[in-house]
């Protein structure tokens, strides 16, 4: 499987899993009425509508901010998708696919509902992590993949410009 196809598979699976969990929990359960759902001593399902970006920063109540964030997400997805098309390692392709799938999943929420549906809350003792969703987890995993790819000898070699006379990477 080429790096691009691996990335495309990661993108599609991320998008499907993200939207399926959000739609299933919101429309297929009574979570909205009976939250929180205790999954483990350190994890709950809750309903949080995030009108901002990561960690709830830059909350947007108006329509202009909402659509600017949708446009920014789509522009980032297009740019990262073009990078994914040129990926030369499977790890890079998958990492970019996870990020693009997550960005598109959250953009769909923001366009449809004006906010992103977050539902996973991790906590222990007095410590509490922000509430997130599958798309957010995929974006974080993708960023970790980008870092790992950049640190690998193959990843560094893949980004080196071809020597004069070397063929361009095959798309």
Curated annotation (Swiss-Prot):
One annotated GO biological process: proteolysis
EC id: 3.4.23.36
Transmembrane segments: 7-27, 64-84, 88-108, 128-148
Pfam families hit by this protein: Peptidase_A8
Keywords: Aspartyl protease, Cell inner membrane, Cell membrane, Hydrolase, Membrane, Protease, Transmembrane, Transmembrane helix
Places the protein is found: Cell inner membrane
Main location: membrane
Active site positions, chain numbering: 118, 136
GO MF annotation terms: aspartic-type endopeptidase activity
Pathway, per record: Protein modification; lipoprotein biosynthesis (signal peptide cleavage)
Gene Ontology cellular-component annotations: plasma membrane
Membrane topology qualifier: Multi-pass membrane protein
NCBIfam families: lspA
Protein family membership: Belongs to the peptidase A8 family.
Known role: This protein specifically catalyzes the removal of signal peptides from prolipoproteins.
Protein name (Swiss-Prot/TrEMBL): Lipoprotein signal peptidase
Taxonomic classification: Bacteria, Pseudomonadati, Pseudomonadota, Alphaproteobacteria, Hyphomicrobiales
């Amino acid at each position: 499987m080429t790096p691009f196809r691996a990335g495309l598979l990661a993108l599609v699976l991320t998008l499907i899993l993200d939207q399926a969990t959000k739609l299933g929990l919101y429309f297929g359960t009574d979570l909205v009425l009976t939250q929180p759902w205790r999954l483990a001593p350190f994890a709950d399902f809750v309903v949080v509508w995030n009108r901002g970006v990561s960690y709830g920063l830059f909350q947007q109540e108006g329509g202009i901010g909402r659509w600017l964030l949708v446009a920014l997400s789509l522009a980032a997805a297009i740019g990262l998708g073009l990078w994914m098309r040129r990926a030369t390692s499977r790890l890079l392709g998958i990492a970019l696919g996870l990020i693009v799938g997550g960005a598109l999943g959250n953009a769909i929420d923001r366009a449809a509902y004006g906010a992103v549906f977050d539902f996973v809350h991790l906590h222990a003792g007095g410590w509490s992590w922000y509430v997130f969703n599958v798309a957010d987890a995929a974006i974080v995993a993708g960023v970790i993949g980008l870092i790992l790819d950049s640190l690998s000898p193959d990843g560094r070699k893949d980004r080196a410009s071809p020597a004069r006379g070397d063929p361009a990477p095959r798309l």
